[in-house]
From Swiss-Prot:
Complex formation: Homotetramer. Dimer of dimers.
Effect of residue 437 to Q: Does not affect DNA binding affinity
Predominant localisation class: cytoplasm
InterPro entries with a match to the protein in the record: Acyl-CoA_dehydrogenase-like (IPR052904), Acyl-CoA_DH_CS (IPR006089), Acyl-CoA_Oxase/DH_mid-dom (IPR006091), AcylCo_DH-like_C (IPR036250), AcylCo_DH/oxidase_C (IPR009075), AcylCoA_DH/oxidase_NM_dom_sf (IPR009100), AidB (IPR034184), AidB_N (IPR041504)
Gene3D superfamilies named among the record's database cross-references: 2.40.110.20, 6.10.250.600, Butyryl-CoA Dehydrogenase, subunit A, domain 3
Pfam families registered for this protein in UniProt: Acyl-CoA_dh_1 (PF00441), Acyl-CoA_dh_M (PF02770), AidB_N (PF18158)
Task performed by this protein: Part of the adaptive DNA-repair response to alkylating agents. Could prevent alkylation damage by protecting DNA and destroying alkylating agents that have yet to reach their DNA target. Binds to double-stranded DNA with a preference for a DNA region that includes its own promoter. Shows weak isovaleryl-CoA dehydrogenase activity in vitro.
The name this protein goes by in its record: Putative acyl-CoA dehydrogenase AidB
The record's note on its domains: The N-terminal region contains FAD-dependent dehydrogenase activity and the C-terminal region contains DNA-binding activity.
Cofactor requirement: FAD
Annotated positions binding FAD: 182-191, 216-218, 423-433
Variant or mutagenesis effect after changing residue 518 to Q: Reduces DNA binding affinity
Organism: Escherichia coli (strain K12)
Amino acid sequence: MHWQTHTVFNQPIPLNNSNLYLSDGALCEAVTREGAGWDSDFLASIGQQLGTAESLELGRLANVNPPELLRYDAQGRRLDDVRFHPAWHLLMQALCTNRVHNLAWEEDARSGAFVARAARFMLHAQVEAGSLCPITMTFAATPLLLQMLPAPFQDWTTPLLSDRYDSHLLPGGQKRGLLIGMGMTEKQGGSDVMSNTTRAERLEDGSYRLVGHKWFFSVPQSDAHLVLAQTAGGLSCFFVPRFLPDGQRNAIRLERLKDKLGNRSNASCEVEFQDAIGWLLGLEGEGIRLILKMGGMTRFDCALGSHAMMRRAFSLAIYHAHQRHVFGNPLIQQPLMRHVLSRMALQLEGQTALLFRLARAWDRRADAKEALWARLFTPAAKFVICKRGMPFVAEAMEVLGGIGYCEESELPRLYREMPVNSIWEGSGNIMCLDVLRVLNKQAGVYDLLSEAFVEVKGQDRYFDRAVRRLQQQLRKPAEELGREITHQLFLLGCGAQMLKYASPPMAQAWCQVMLDTRGGVRLSEQIQNDLLLRATGGVCV
């Protein structure tokens, strides 16, 4: 018997086979403006590949098939390994092929390589975010290791700089590509790493014996981890490889994988060091200094990753609104919905402008002024963007309605993924305290801000008023106001970039919406049209 109760209609088809790069006008402009226009053709190519149904399916598969801890083999021998779904390995292979883990560190890296790498990172993050964890840690650790690789591991340089992903369980020197992890957090300390109890004792050959634990040990399958441990000289940073120079496994015991809210594809582990061997990087007592050198880059990636997921959520929402009809018209033509989507697009415009200005600062960090710019605005961007992500994705869910709340949609996974970047590499308060530390202790920071804001002074009254408000707060920056100061600093950083590079009507609209404390701003029809055109590559208007 043939059953047919109804015909399915007015249900949008899934967003597959789109170009993640060319559909994002703000990103395309920022890449060229900030010095990586030479990578545009390649970005368009990988944007097309990553936007396919096949790539998006890999992201889904990697999350519904989380990693599995293998502590013992069938005979009871320790394995201390992690098994991943094949989709994970394909995602990692694509990331390494596209050099998201080391583009800026190649010997012949071009000017703007940090900017190009940021764009590549952002495109991959829209497909699957968990696989970016090993990539960002490897990216941050590589420049330090290129300077400080211990003598027994000098043959690691070539695989560190390769474009290969190698998941084989082998010593690093025998592999075609390497991953580096970090181990800092302990049960009692969290962000307070000075309270770490893991001890390191120097041995006769110059290596150290480590005894202790780590509570969150990301990517336990990495070829080595940079680990904080206490020495006679204070908290220090150690290179702790998975395999020792003689080919034996190091004494790193994998105890349990974390059962996390999101980030399901990525393995986060509890580990114990039972006389593990490590090699000191730098001097005893320099652990915090070395970790902070890497922490700035991983914090930047947190902000970039959250922004990318916001961009993906917005793309799903506007694509749905373009196809779905209500009351006889496309949802995107309904005045209130069009205004909501336009404001979401405007928010992404400002974030894109600031993030890629930050990427340029990281690219030119040899210049003291650029390094200071990155030092100040990186924690500010991480604080604000990572916090914005959750309500932003929830707003995108509302555009789709009930179907956006179902697991068949990408949005539940994006929503669960969002909180991790607010926590990883320092939660919100840590970011705000870091901003205050820069404002209170870094010479030249007020001159830097003055120069950035004076450059666009007089172009918008809301911006000028917000600058004066921040100046008053900075006369005596109280710790209790750290969040407000950080948020205001971030907004002014975005506003300065918008006033400098966006069209005057769009820049002024951004300043009024984001900086007018009275609220109730209505975007003009022309601004809405421009925003939605730029946000979709001219498709959904």
